[in-house]
Amino acid sequence: MTTLTLNTSLLSSCRILAAFSGGLDSTVLLHQLVLWRERHPDVTLRAIHIHHGLSPHADSWVRHCETVCERWQVPLVVERVTLADNGLGIEAHAREARYRAFAQTLLPGEVLATAQHLDDQCETFLLALKRGSGPAGLSAMGECSPFAGTLLLRPLLRETRKTLEQWAVRHGLCWIEDESNQDDAYDRNFLRLRALPLLQQRWPHFPAAVARSATLCAEQERLLDELLASDLTDCITAEGTLRLSPLMLMSDVRRAAILRRWLAMRNAPMPSRDALERIWQEVALARDDASPCLRFGDHEIRRYQSQLWWIKTVAGQHETTVVWPVWQTPLALPAGLGTVQLVPGGELRRPREEESVSIRFKAPGVLHIVGRNGGRKLKKIWQEQGIPPWRRDTTPLLFYGETLIAAAGVFVTREGAAEDKEGVSLVWHA
């Protein structure tokens, strides 16, 4: 390999963030990008290293990456992530944490470059085949993919691991060896260490042939996207939920294709055929009076008002009270529910000096809200306002003392209504 075949989208970008583990692949990628920067002085190049804390050598890997980046004059960002069991397995969870850190580190106008190569593409295809994936899963990885509002580029995707090794040796590059890469208990390592060498011994061009198949699958998926675009428009609401009535009229095959694309739009993991069947049978077709729920990692699919919802799992906060000692400043909510803030200009009265301020998630008794005659219990108000059941004990309720003032984004009580122009608004950043 004498030159790197950069994705054409990369050629038009002047701001690049390179994922840099310090291993062979990412070292070659960063080296190539440094050479690219030398030829194009307007290019701004940064690197990011993710410290997973999984290896006893993780700290020394950070020092290695710092040394390399200092020598090549590449600013390095080191992000430490904490991995907890989320039911996806350590490989999937580490990958999820990595890409979340990448997304948070990207600057406006910056693209992300990662070092996957042809052998990685082959492994990804075979893993998808093992899972029984269809054309979407077998499409494997693209050279250019949307990511976090920008692009994820894989400039080495047409190069083999052997070619990368030859480049690294020829240019005297130093890289680290992750001991976990030799553990064939991991599926990807098993393919790389055992299966692929045997296949390539028999068929030397096997990875390239697999890559062609992946490309053909990707083309078929793009064609399906075009053909199903009008169906998606009919089925998906402005809130991103999936209307069930059009799906009821579709064939099983067409409906499954719509479900997959809706989940992909919600950044959900690609579901198996069995998972799609469960979504339809256990959630969509559940009894009318049921509140069906199907968990997928830290998310779940629910049905409400003849629509499917993809939501993050949040524990109910029914018994939680959060004291708001200084109501002029934002208040952080528990369970990742975001923050609330009282801002000038609105229909809520300000708290009186003697009134304590708090956020709660339940309210007893009969309530009287602005714009409605008569009193209602909170459950009835939620139903009338079309608030899904899972949001009813996670929607912040503003209290002054023991008096309910408002529900964020839903209603204001008569006791909470402003009587002058000095009112405030309850803003919830979920």
Swiss-Prot record:
Top EC category: ligase
Location of the protein in the cell: Cytoplasm
A molecular function (GO) term: tRNA(Ile)-lysidine synthase activity
Disulfide bonds: none
Record-listed ATP binding positions: S21, G22, G23, L24, D25, S26
An annotated GO BP: tRNA modification
Domain of life from the UniProt record: Bacteria
Keywords annotated in UniProt: ATP-binding, Cytoplasm, Ligase, Nucleotide-binding, tRNA processing
Enzyme Commission code: 6.3.4.19
Catalytic activity, reaction form: cytidine(34) in tRNA(Ile2) + L-lysine + ATP = lysidine(34) in tRNA(Ile2) + AMP + diphosphate + H(+)
Any GO CC annotation of this UniProt entry: cytoplasm
Primary location recorded for the protein, binned into one broad class: cytoplasm
Function field: Ligates lysine onto the cytidine present at position 34 of the AUA codon-specific tRNA(Ile) that contains the anticodon CAU, in an ATP-dependent manner. Cytidine is converted to lysidine, thus changing the amino acid specificity of the tRNA from methionine to isoleucine.
Domain comment (free text): The N-terminal region contains the highly conserved SGGXDS motif, predicted to be a P-loop motif involved in ATP binding.
Name this protein carries in UniProt: tRNA(Ile)-lysidine synthase
Organism: Salmonella heidelberg (strain SL476)
Source species taxonomy: Bacteria, Pseudomonadati, Pseudomonadota, Gammaproteobacteria, Enterobacterales
Gene for this chain: tilS
